[in-house]
């Protein structure tokens, strides 16, 4: 399995001839859109920063789209989606939006992508069904209740990530802030790593097999877009 970061909350996961993408970036996003073919596309939040299904419909690949809670299976990949809340990128008059947390099982590993999560606790259903996480993608954009980007603050992100006991933690959403600007917001990654207090490693891509997870216990890996 090879995991690469394409900005914001977008991660491409390839294994064999199959490509899965979390939160592909659309053309009308403030972020650079993605452009590659995917077999499976998971959309956590209906927003241009995360719903670019057309951009991953490319060549001979037309993705099977998952855009909400439920149980799914496609080409040997098992996906569970759990309802949660986001306050990211709300339209005028909105107070909250639907966010979907995804648990994906493939190659004997479990990947969990929290999406644009604002809830500091997972639902009972998610807690009961998500277990033994190998790779956790956690949003770290909001800096505080007063200067929130609509997702978890670095402190809340760290607390939730630790409670889920993943083998590897991959922070996300920080590059979205760095690219779109905002006072202090581009420092979200620095703030998160300071909050976490343990060492981290920056990599351009994550090549992973089940055996590689031995010895990992909450290791933080920063995938650079």
PLM region spans:
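Non-globular, low-confidence helical/coil segments that flank catalytic cores
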Residues: 38-40, 50-88, 159-162, 168, ...
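Hydrophobic, well-ordered secondary-structure segments
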Residues: 130-133, 137, 154-158, 166, ...
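Core dinuclear metal-dependent hydrolase active-site scaffold
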Residues: 1-40, 47-49, 62-131, 135, ...
């Amino acid at each position: 399995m090879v995991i690469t970061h394409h900005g914001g909350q977008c991660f491409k996961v390839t294994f064999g001839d199959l490509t899965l993408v979390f939160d592909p970036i659309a053309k009308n996003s403030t972020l650079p859109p993605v452009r590659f073919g995917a077999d499976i596309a998971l959309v956590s939040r209906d927003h241009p920063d995360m719903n670019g299904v057309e951009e991953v419909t490319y060549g001979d690949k037309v993705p099977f789209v998952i855009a909400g809670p439920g149980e799914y299976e496609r080409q040997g990949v098992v996906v569970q989606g759990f309802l949660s809340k986001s306050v990211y990128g709300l339209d005028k008059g909105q107070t909250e939006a639907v966010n979907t947390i995804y648990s994906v099982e493939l190659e004997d590993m479990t990947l969990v992508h929290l999406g644009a999560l604002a809830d500091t606790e997972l639902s009972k259903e998610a807690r009961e069904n998500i277990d033994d996480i190998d790779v956790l993608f956690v949003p770290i954009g909001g800096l505080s209740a007063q200067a929130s980007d609509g997702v978890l603050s670095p402190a809340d992100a760290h607390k939730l990530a630790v409670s889920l006991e993943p083998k590897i933690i991959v922070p996300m959403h920080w590059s979205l802030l760095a690219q779109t600007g905002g006072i202090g917001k581009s420092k979200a990654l620095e703030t998160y790593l300071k909050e976490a207090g343990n060492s981290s490693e920056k990599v351009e891509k994550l090549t992973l097999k089940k055996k590689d997870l031995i010895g990992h216990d909450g290791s933080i890996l920063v995938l650079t877009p």
